Each structure stands twice: as structure tokens, then as C-alpha cells.
């Protein structure tokens, strides 16, 4: 199992390119199953979950054609089986996204419940209830969701999401694209990745209005045709490198990104004392060697501050001037990284869903363990500014969401290397 060794104390300085968004690429790949001809998806990030989704298509009898730039062509007409097996989907919650497209396009689907995913405790039940509202007959047995469309296909429906669910919104929107009649999704997720998926579906011929608002209207069509589409840039990767620059007092320009989808994060970085300038597809952050000021953060659904940037801002507050409160309103158990940061000397107190962070001038390198994707990014950021060496274990979590993280940080001057376990 690989590890990262980081020697802190270097101010980041330079330019990097941002990868395509994983959370956009996965639903877009799932949506290719709706097409009745070949579809090309460009700007895919080189990540484990993307590879798993492409491997899943291979198991179904589809033979994706991938080029060296990680553009993939998929022709779903060659599909031979409508089963997404457990051994593939157990590591990837996004596998549930093939459920809606398969039922809508082929009339049935059998998808293993993603690993550790209990019905009711996570919003898988919203996916099921949404499809049932469209007439699908669904059984959950033996760890699989087995779904069939009614005779004549799925029917348009009005559906209200009890809680805002990004993947739930995406799944039902995809299914509704080929349903008979009109569907209206209320309390829908407004994330940019939902809009990106809607734009891809529209490129294939779907009739969708209101993506990016909490009410999405879909008029079902008879067929969706071939298309070529470029995945949007990753806003969380963008934010992570900007925070890394801020924490080290450095200057970073991130290219091939979109400042308009990151406004809540950019405002907080400016509040922390960063000079932020933007262009159409780039953002530059410059701390001019200064130590950041602590900021208060409260996570909430888009367009508010994203939960996936919460851990990175705890790292920022840990070395900032003053005290900042970070309130997590989206997920439980999202402060696992705090206990690893204590090993580096961070002064953080957790009270319920709030982390109160008192900045300290110095963090010390230590052996730490990544616990999940975004928590692992916060440990990397803290290590960049810590005195001495930090050894980060279980970095497969990082590899799930960050393409070539050590190479990109090396381009910015960081002393970081990957070592085999």
C-alpha cells in the first residue's frame, strides 16, 4: 500500500492544470447507456472510480475505446448483460447511477447495493422511490436492486426529494429523459455537476429545463442520439490547490478551471487574506508570504460552502491567526482527520457538528493515516506547512479523487514523494 512522504516548509509557487470533475464524469458515463449510438466523453480524470466504471461497461459487453488523453467512446448498443455485479461496485457508490439509465433504455436492471450502503440511512431509497413513482417495479434482495420498467416503459412523474440528493437527482433525471411524458423533480440538487449532466443529456437530444435550480422539468423523448461532450473541471481539486497555496503563504495559478462554480470558496480565501484574481478559465491566488487569518465556515448544499472543502479549511485554520469555527451540516462523522491532525500539533476541539480551530504558528511532521478522500487532502495540506517529514498512510483514498497529486504538487515546488508500502 503506497504512502506519501512530505517535507514541509516550502512556499508553493507555479501553475498547474485542473483535471475533469470525477463527480461529473461518473454520472455522464452512466448516461451514455441511454444513447442509441456511439458517444464520446472527453476530459475524464485518470482516477480509480473512472477506471472501475469503464470496467463495469466491459463486463456488460460494451467495449469502451479509450485514447491517451482519456477520452472514451462508448457504444451501448453492444450491451449483453444488465447486471452490475457486487465485486465491481463494492468500492464505488456512484455505481448506483447506472440503475436509472438501464431501466429507462433497456427496461430492466440489476445493480448491487454499493458497499456498506444500508437502505434508509443513505439516500439510495430516494433513487428507488423516484423510479417507483415512474412505474418501475423494484425489489431489493440478496444485496441487489432488481428493477423492471412497466409495459410501455417508464412514465413521467412529479417527484419531491425529501432531502437534497445529488446522485438521486441525477439518476431520476436520466431515467426521465426517456420516460413517456413530463417529469418534474422538486427539491432537486443544484450542484454544477447536475447542470453538467443535464447539458450532456441535452447534447444527446433530451428536453430538460431548470437544471441548476431546485425544480427540474424533463419532457421525455423517444430516443437519445450520439454526442461528443467535454466534462467540466473539478471545483474541489481547484479549491484544494488554492488552499494549499494559501496555507504555505505561496502563489498558485490553476488553469483549465471555472471560477464561477467556486464562489463561496474564493470569498472565504479572500476573507483569509489571500489576493485572488480570476479569468475565464483560470484562478490565481497569492498570499505574498503572509500567514492566513482564521475564517468561520458552514457547509450547506450548493451554492453555499461545499462539504468537500471543509477538511481543507480546517487545515487552513490550524495554522492561521486567530480561531475559526467549521460547522458541518451535510454529513456525520466528517471530522475523522482532526484526530490525525492532533498528532501534528493542531489545536482543534470537536463539539457535535462543529470543529473549533485555534491557529498555531507551527505544525510538526508526524506519521498519520488518511481516513477518507477529503480528509486525506487536509493531511497533505498540513504536511506541506509542517516542520520536518510527514508520512501519510492509506493514500489510496487520495488517489480516488486527485489525479497525480504528488506530480502536481512537485510542479509547484513541494517536496513530496510516493513510496511503496
Curated annotation (Swiss-Prot):
It catalyses: phosphoenolpyruvate + UDP-N-acetyl-alpha-D-glucosamine = UDP-N-acetyl-3-O-(1-carboxyvinyl)-alpha-D-glucosamine + phosphate. One of its GO terms (molecular function) is UDP-N-acetylglucosamine 1-carboxyvinyltransferase activity. InterPro entries: Enolpyruvate_Tfrase_dom, Enolpyruvate_Tfrase_sf, MurA_subfamily, RNA3'P_cycl/enolpyr_Trfase_a/b, UDP_GlcNAc_COvinyl_MurA. CDD domains: UdpNAET. The active site is at residue 117. Pfam families: EPSP_synthase. Disulfide bonds: none annotated. Pathway: Cell wall biogenesis; peptidoglycan biosynthesis. Belongs to the EPSP synthase family. MurA subfamily. Cell wall formation. Adds enolpyruvyl to UDP-N-acetylglucosamine. This is UDP-N-acetylglucosamine 1-carboxyvinyltransferase. It comes from Pseudomonas savastanoi pv. phaseolicola (strain 1448A / Race 6). The gene is murA.
